[in-house]
């Protein structure tokens, strides 16, 4: 005979209780010790009890297994790091004694050199890519963060306060990713957004080569150019002339001798370059899978079809475009 409704509800209530305690422990670990907890690669910070239950079920591990691990971490001295408790529970021989494996990870984390402060990051451009990057940096901010969003650069020309309000609205809501789970305040007097405690000044500048980022306390920053306006050494090199910029990352395929890097495929080619491209969206979508297939089986030739959303420089009508494949019907 199937279990009674009361028994099912009791089991659910107990699981919810475990999930609530797990979510609280994860939050305390991040805030107090700078430890970011994952379950089989999925970030747990900021999740609700129901989200924790769904996440654990998808990972095939139980909250009764992971909760003791995060509670043990709270009781131990540990430096900022990232720990996947789902892998600890499910991996052999760690599955026999996950606490022993946890202690080994703690010792390894404490033995590593940790930066005194996260690396400064500047977003040059705040379109769709820029806003999604901002979401990621804000979501991952905290004591364990290795990078910190310090400023955003936008084109001048409109009333800056009205522009900032609109950009805050676009950051809050995305047509694909939905509402951004963050508190966003608009500091009109100082032209800045305050997102989850991160103060992000907005700099309105017409050129990339005459901005003094050090006035915002920024130094040796990674500047992420997501405008696509400049794609070669001479154009992107203008950023390096501004005070406070250490390296430049382009979020589009580059031209000339700038290396196009797909992480996990050819990132070992990054040596002393100060300007690097993250390649195209199509390249990042296809290359990691192709690289695995090529290493395992070999690829002689192939054909790739890409289905791409229209971009913001296209009309949502049947029309011409300077790039042949972009002059298409909507």
Q: Predicted regions span which residues?
A:
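Mobile gating loops/cap/lid regions near enzyme active sites that modulate substrate access
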Residues: 318-330
């Amino acid at each position: 005979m199937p279990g009674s409704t009361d028994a099912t509800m009791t089991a659910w209530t107990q699981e919810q209780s475990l999930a609530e305690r797990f979510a609280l422990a994860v939050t305390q670990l991040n805030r107090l010790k700078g430890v970011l907890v994952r379950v089989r690669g999925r970030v747990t910070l900021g999740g609700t009890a129901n989200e924790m239950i769904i996440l654990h079920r998808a990972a095939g591990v139980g909250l009764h297994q992971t909760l003791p691990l995060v509670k043990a971490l709270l009781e131990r001295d540990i430096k900022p790091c990232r720990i996947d408790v789902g892998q600890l529970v499910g991996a052999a021989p760690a599955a026999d004694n996950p606490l022993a494996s946890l202690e080994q990870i703690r010792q390894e984390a404490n033995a590593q050199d940790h930066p005194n402060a996260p690396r400064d990051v500047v977003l040059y451009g705040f379109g769709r890519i820029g806003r999604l990057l901002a979401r990621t940096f804000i979501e991952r901010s905290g004591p364990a963060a290795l990078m910190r969003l310090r400023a955003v650069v936008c084109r001048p020309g409109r009333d800056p306060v009205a522009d900032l309000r609109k950009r805050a609205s676009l950051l809050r809501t995305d047509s694909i990713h939905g509402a951004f789970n963050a508190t966003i305040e608009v500091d009109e007097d100082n032209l800045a957004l305050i997102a989850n405690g991160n103060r992000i000044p907005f700099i309105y500048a017409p050129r990339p080569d005459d901005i003094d980022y050090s006035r915002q306390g920024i130094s040796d920053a990674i500047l992420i150019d997501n405008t696509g306006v400049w794609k070669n050494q001479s154009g992107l090199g203008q950023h390096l002339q501004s005070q406070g910029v250490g390296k430049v990352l382009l979020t589009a395929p580059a031209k000339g001798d700038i290396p196009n890097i797909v992480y996990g495929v050819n990132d070992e080619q990054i040596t002393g370059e100060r300007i690097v491209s993250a390649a195209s969206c199509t390249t990042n979508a296809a290359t990691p899978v192709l690289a695995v297939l090529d290493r395992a089986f070999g690829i002689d030739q192939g054909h790739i079809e890409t289905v791409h959303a229209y971009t913001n420089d296209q009309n949502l009508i049947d029309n011409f475009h300077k790039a042949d494949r972009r002059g298409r019907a909507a």
